[in-house]
Amino acid sequence: MTYSGDFIRRTRNPITHQSLLNRRLAMPHFLGMALLIGVMTGSAYATDNQQPQQRKTIQKPTPAIHDVHNGDVPSPSVAPEYKLQTVSREGVEYIEKLRKGTPFGTTDFNLEGLRAGMGTRNEPHLEGVKLIRLKIGDIPCEWVLAPGADPDVRLLYLHGGGWVSGSGGNYLPLAVDISVAAKCAVLLPDYRLAPEHRFPAGLEDCIAAHEWMVANGPSGPCPAKATFIAGDSAGGNLTLATLLALRDRKRTLPAGGIAISAATDFTLASESLRTIHDPIISARTMPEFRDRYLDKTDPRNPLASPVFGDYRGIPPLLIQVGEHEMLRDDSVRVAKKAVSDGIPVKLEVWPGMVHVFHIRGLPESREAIEHIAEFMSACAYPARAHAPSIHSSAAVPQRFCRRTTWKVRRAPRCR
């Protein structure tokens, strides 16, 4: 199986402005919690009672997809000029609203307030969803199984929250969206948090949860057909670190990994930390998170800062990040490192988007989740389809439009 090694920024099929005005978009059913490094202050997360609706977008020209072999991935040393390059009206309005606010952590770091928001349970609003609470050893967890999902295709989702806050219950709506789109069971672990439990306590919980999930599903003991690990922000960091640790310990690896808006470098060397004004979170928070999580651990430890990892032997990766978030270059750099180690990587830098935009209830949010589902399907069922197709348009030179196949490992079906 081969992979082209391209870094990909997807574009969407154009529709007219008038047709967008004539369509009614789904309305949000609840407000989400303030999240930064997995949390967003003053933002809304939408989930629908129905299946995800058809995308309603306006095509705007975007730069070409970047080819890693030509060395023209988004330059970490160049901050994109702030222009509303989102392709949906909702995205434009949402980001304009964000720009009027104050990013989290601009004046102070309120850990208690952060935990209060991120610890709130957000019940999903889709009928027929199965929620199963359990413990893996001492780790509280919850299964999420949407109607029609395959319980033997399993995703371990690691929540964000800066390593110091957050809970699986706060991420139930996103877990439902992924379960619906990817037709998989989603396991949400409440891994241990800093500063009470510093590195590598939370990471060890993530490793243990995946090892358990390989042999156990929502209905009890049963080998998985395929497993995946995903996470956002701090959870994206833990996703990559868990993959590295599983490989190093010669444990069963998942079929693929998905890192969303991941923080990958505790040396804080990414240029975007200084050049991008993030409307969600202030760069001042990064030393606060680091010091509470790492304490005296070397910030160049690959299990703490995955950008310094050796990715040989790691399964395929899907990396998604917003163009206008301060952690953008963390994703770009780790993707380049993994590709240099010979690993299949798909990097999506979403024009105009912000930190963990998947939870915002935007058309881009739904499309990004669809991309996750496509990636998982390509890894779990290689005989059914090629890897996620790459749409071409006038804005994307044909030389960047290549197909991909992914290496997959299988497990026996339950009887």
What label would you give each PLM region?
Residues 169-187:
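Short amphipathic alpha-helix adjacent to the substrate-entry channel of hydrolases
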Residues 197-217:
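Alpha/beta-hydrolase active-site loop
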Residues 214-228, 249:
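Gly/Ser-rich "nucleophile elbow"/oxyanion-hole loop immediately N-terminal to the catalytic nucleophile
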Residues 244-297, 313:
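Hydrolase active-site cap/lid region
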Residues 353-363:
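Catalytic histidine-centered segment of alpha/beta-hydrolase-like enzymes
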